[in-house]
């Protein structure tokens, strides 16, 4: 059997890992649309919580209190459709909204509604999950295990395009530049919104989220696929662009 561009004979692990990551990201993304569509109309009011906190688990949770309409986080929940408790939903919908509660601010003005129900996460996070799905598919299509995360990450590009980077030994810089291109727009948009009076818009949140999600999914799959044991722990057996060789220091 002819060897691949990394010196191995197959991409079984790369394909399997990427299918798993894509299924998780894509599955949750799909549920974010299905849950509000299937729930009774008006079941989820306008929310406004905190990231990395459970704000709407029960009727007595933080998000269901009166924090004032001018508060930087939270609002007067009674003025926005009443209380919401995702623990009272069926197990699947509870997982979808509970995960969103923990990971997202769930600000209603930054979220979409379906069937009169606010979606579990904001539009930025919708973009991120879509990007994670796309990034996993990208690495599953092109990526190779090349021992290190940086070399595996860059394997998505054609070897001939990588030759100048390998000849100059700028692989780490190249990877960081690509990641920066993906994360930069979201960071600028998000931090500008947080630190100034600027307010982004949902289409821009989606686009910057997608760009960030792509490089996150791409890097994550690279990290999971970069394994030395498939080369017999022999760095000399790894094929790299420009006939470069890995050496252990």
PLM regions: where:
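Membrane-water interface of alpha-helical transmembrane segments
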Residues: 11-22, 169-179, 199-202, 206
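Extracytosolic (periplasmic/ER-lumenal) interhelical loops and adjacent juxtamembrane/interface segments
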Residues: 41-119
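Small-polar-interrupted transmembrane alpha-helices in polytopic inner-membrane proteins
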Residues: 24-32, 102, 131-135, 168-193
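Interfacial helix-loop-helix junctions of multi-pass membrane proteins
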Residues: 42-46, 110-120, 187-212
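Hydrophobic cores of alpha-helical transmembrane segments in multi-pass inner/ER membrane proteins
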Residues: 131-136, 210-226
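Membrane-interfacial, low-structure loops and terminal tails that flank and connect transmembrane helices
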Residues: 1-11, 146-172, 232-249
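Mid-length scaffold segments of soluble, non-membrane domains
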Residues: 112-152
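Hydrophobic secretory-pathway targeting helix
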Residues: 1-44
